[in-house]
Amino acid sequence: MKPTQSIMSRYKIAQSKNHYENFTVGSLVLGKDMREAIMTLYAFARLGDDIADEGNHSKKERTEQIQYLKNHLKKIEFNQKINDSYFKILQILYIKYKFRINNLYRFINAFNEDINHKQYAQFSDLIRYCDNAANPAGELILSLVKQDNKENVRQSNAICTALALINFAQGVVEDFEKGRIYIPKDEMKTFNLKVEDIQQRNFTKYWVKYKKYWVERNCQILGRGLGLGEKIKGRLGIEIQMVECAALLLLKRMKRNSCNLFVSPPKIKTLDWIFIFFKVALRSL
């Protein structure tokens, strides 16, 4: 069976899953063409994630499925005939927008890394992973509107890395159940953090201290990207500003002493998005 079979159905299912992604994809703020383009690219990322997370298949089987995706990217890149229905859509998108396809290859690297995941030794290793797993998303979106200059990409990468780190903090327990720990080994040792605490959902004083450290560092990373949305014209700029506001709100909630990441990690709810939309809209007047 092709790994892309019924991909749009899989994508719709993924949208309804109780996963830890807080940020809008293909928001109604965007125009129809841009929304469909972003959703098509997002479907690629979600499909790769789903393959990497599929515990019922062996590493070999999952690696072969990821290779299938990579082979079809090459067909798109070299304008070869494609029979796979999803990649036909992606090929049309590539011809229309001429987005930087190397960013999809970076996703491939991240998918393979997920399949063979080992806990990272240092924070710099985690940042390197984010550069493949998260940053290409922002760069792809900027390339759709030909706004992927060096400075915009720098800001976008800071935002996307911060979003990924927020998701890691929210999903410590969920990731652990998948056999993954995104907290670097050296920091677990420095802060006296125990793997058993994650398993038992025991948010000790050591985890509280580390959470504050994690949030402060993440605020600094996010700060390097703030303001990108105001620079991008039109609806996409509004969308980026909304994401920036959502990230700030989540970090603010994480910082609270009452926030237990193992039991009730903060999320962005519908009412929050409504408030954020009006906040950004008023700012844009």
Which positions does each model-derived feature cover?
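Catalytic cores of Mg2+-dependent Asp-rich isoprenoid enzymes
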Residues: 1-164, 169-285
